Swiss-Prot record:
Any matching Pfam family: Pterin_4a
The UniProt record lists the keyword Membrane: no
Assigned EC number: 4.2.1.96
Organism (species): Rhodopseudomonas palustris (strain BisB5)
This protein's name: Putative pterin-4-alpha-carbinolamine dehydratase
Length: 101
């Protein structure tokens, strides 16, 4: 089982994924991605879904037109783990392919 990150580890790990923030009231991280249009947003979600499935770690997300809101947490661990940070980093890399920093 993956271990939950302690507060200090969590804060340090978040420095490596700019744009992600801790969610108030729960142990999770979140980011909002804004793309040029719906096609790019959906393309991002498709690519991110393939990475998530490969790693057996799935996001909570919501898409409205060109915006994708993502929340990551590891339910089995009861909070944020390295898996969340790694998926956040992978999503950032995918977003950069669409010109979103």
């Amino acid at each position: 089982m993956v271990e939950r990150l302690a507060a200090a580890e969590r804060h340090k790990a978040l420095q490596g994924v700019p744009g992600w923030r801790e969610v108030d009231g729960r142990e999770a991280i979140a980011r909002i991605f804004t793309f040029k249009d719906f096609n790019e947003a959906f393309g991002f979600m498709t690519r991110a879904a393939l990475v998530a499935e490969k790693n057996d770690h799935h996001p909570e997300w919501r898409n409205v037109y060109k915006t994708v809101e993502v929340v990551l947490t590891t339910h089995d661990a009861g909070g944020i783990t390295r898996r969340d940070i790694d998926l956040a980093s992978a999503m950032d890399a995918i977003a950069r392919q669409f010109g979103v920093a």
